[in-house]
């Protein structure tokens, strides 16, 4: 029996309704977990306030966008020197090819800003012979509970009181494990955030101070490090900045102390008051229905908003 066009349309809408009301909630329920640390979602553990702060600042003019698939598009940027690639919480490792692209991008003058801790951020940090120490960092100078550590960040000579949430230490490895740089490129490391002298790394993960733990010296442990790149000719190139607390820019922490002022000033110190800011959204999706749906919805957001979408398939 043939189905009329009218009946076909009714069946189509009925199918869509069933999928929307029944199948989608079920599939969403079995997804591993919701995406987090996204610049385009408004949950407490996302970073949309960070993005909005950059977009709405009266003191700057940034074009803010996102990379949805992989950093390969960095090879196509026409002016890397005015571009900042922001990575918050690396939930999947960068491949060797992606690291080579990041190295070329920085050799061309591009900058990166990495917020990491217990994740895969070391895949990038090792390019600069540093690492995120994946043991709990304790400090006797804490606030309210042991997880919240107040400290001071120095940006362009100005001090900012900031509040960290379960940071880890950054260790200088001295020698390089991963070298993808062209010959002659150099960088200068500078610590701009550190803990108090009364801090220690819980090396045995028992929550106590024991002989096995690493106690800080008078300078505390580094939790913020800046790497300034120089060409073989000595010309200043891009900057790589590492902050060992992926929760610092999340919405819940945005208004704590001077966190928001610090983050906006940090961006300005890297690319000035104008330029491109690209959030790497490719590290916040998984191979699941819920993650795929989130990424598709994010693509529709750019399409409907008329914003520039930077993506690589």
Predicted regions mapped to residue ranges:
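Short, surface-exposed patches at the edges or C-terminal ends of soluble domains, predominantly
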Residues: 1-313
């Amino acid at each position: 029996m043939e189905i009329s066009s009218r009946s076909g349309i009714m069946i189509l809408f009925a199918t869509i309704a069933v999928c929307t009301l029944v199948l989608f909630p079920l599939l969403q329920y079995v997804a591993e977990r919701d995406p987090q640390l996204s610049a385009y979602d408004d949950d407490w553990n996302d970073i949309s306030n960070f993005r909005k702060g950059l977009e709405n600042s009266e003191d700057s003019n940034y074009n803010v966008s996102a990379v949805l698939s992989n950093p390969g598009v960095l090879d196509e940027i026409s002016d890397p020197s005015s571009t900042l690639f922001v990575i918050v919480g690396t939930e999947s490792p960068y491949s060797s090819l992606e690291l080579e692209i990041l190295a070329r991008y920085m050799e061309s003058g591009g900058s990166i800003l990495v917020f990491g801790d217990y994740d895969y951020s070391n895949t990038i940090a090792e390019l600069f012979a540093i690492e995120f120490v994946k043991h709990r960092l304790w400090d006797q100078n804490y606030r309210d509970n042991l997880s919240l550590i107040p400290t001071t960040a120095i940006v362009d000579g100005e001090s900012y009181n900031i509040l960290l949430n379960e940071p880890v230490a950054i260790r200088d490895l001295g020698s390089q494990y991963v070298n993808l740089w062209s010959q002659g490129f150099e960088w200068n490391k500078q610590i701009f955030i550190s803990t108090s002298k009364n801090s220690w790394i819980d090396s045995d993960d028992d929550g106590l101070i024991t002989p096995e733990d690493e106690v800080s010296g008078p300078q505390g442990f580094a939790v913020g490090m800046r790497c300034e790149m120089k060409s073989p000719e000595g010309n200043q190139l891009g900057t790589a900045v590492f902050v060992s607390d992926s929760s610092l820019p999340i919405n819940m922490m945005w208004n704590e102390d001077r966190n928001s002022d610090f983050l906006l000033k940090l961006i300005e110190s890297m690319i000035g008051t104008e330029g491109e800011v690209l959030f790497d959204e490719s590290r916040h999706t998984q191979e699941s229905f819920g993650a795929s749906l989130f990424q598709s919805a994010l693509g529709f957001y750019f399409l409907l908003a008329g914003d520039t979408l930077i993506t690589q398939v």
